[in-house]
Amino acid sequence: MVKVAVVGASGYAGSQLCRIISRHEKLELTGLFVSENSLDKGKKISELYGELNGLCDKVLQPLTGAKDIIDIADAVFLATDHKVSHDIAPALVDAGVAVFDLSGAFRISNTDVFEKAYGFAHEHKDLLKKAVYALAEYVDVKALQNTKMISLPGCYPTASQLALKPLIENGLLDLNYRPSINAVSGVSGAGRKAKLTNSFCEVSLNAYGVFTHRHQPEIAEHLGTEVIFTPHLGDFKRGIHATINAKLKDGVTPEQVAKAYSYYDNKPLVRVKKGMPKLQDVQYLPFCDIGYAMKDNYIVICSCIDNLLKGASAQAVQVLNLYYGFDETQGLI
């Protein structure tokens, strides 16, 4: 059994990790941690999330330092603020703990771009170079298994990259025209902390972070091309629906596009649909559903994920499964 801890367990992604790990036959959940000033410390996780009652009743412990984790875990999920992950990851890696980081602290390799996106300077450049960015369907498993620092993609980047990578890697897009990504996320993507804009009577459908969202440089770096990314907040609980417009090279055929997407034929958590996917088909599930339509030299791709699962906790466990050589769907389906 692999001993696993979760930091940031009281958040939405953290709670989903607790649920998945508790049902995983090869993982033992050894510790749940929150910040020292959290109002949730000392409570059982099941007091916050009734779905965990009887499944995971562990107490949320205040995290005093890396040693709390090192003493009890082979691997840790950091479902934390970016700065928290940035600060604690080096000590964990040095102690031999496998770090699966759900924050953005190690996603962007250019430190100048990182600082502009996240608002603080990256102080661990050596570890940043060693970090493996683990989009599950594309990660180099050998490289993954040779590091202790695993950076997990963001929710929007997961939906966007899974939709576009087959076309880009097969050279089918005319990249003189930037792909345009318009993605709508449920309110859970904004986190559990109460905010006026996320309250029941205030939440609406609106664009935000136009040209400034920190996921834009992440998407661009790992696709290898610039994109136009416009995120939206939707008036629903969970899920992401991304609609992507792109230009195909002259002469690209439907058969070439279909062959490109056949890459996912042996990827159990990506489903390529004949029509356009529906958000309801992936909510509370670990899948990414993709559909597309072509006309002239243009293609519209739609990609749907559950932002808390394929966009966060389920992908994190999927990558852990790959890291330890388990079936990648272990504990997920």
Question: Predicted regions span which residues?
Answer:
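N-terminal Rossmann-like NAD(P) cofactor-binding subdomain of oxidoreductases
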Residues: V2-C201, N206-Y208, M294-K295, Q330-L332
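Conserved active-site and cofactor/substrate-binding residues in soluble primary-metabolism enzymes
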Residues: Y12, K130, T158-L162, V210-E218, ...
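C-terminal active-site/capping subdomain that shapes the small-molecule cofactor and substrate pocket
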Residues: N245-I333
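C-terminal substrate-binding/catalytic lobe of Rossmann-fold NAD(P)-dependent dehydrogenases
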Residues: T197, F211-V272
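Short, solvent-exposed beta-strand edge segments and adjacent coil->beta transition regions
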Residues: T147, G239-T243, Y298-V300
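Short Gly/Pro-enriched turn/cap motifs at secondary-structure boundaries
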Residues: A207-F211, L233-D235, K278-V282
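Predominant activation on well-ordered alpha-helical scaffold segments within soluble catalytic domains
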Residues: C18, Q161-I168, Q216-A220, A258, ...
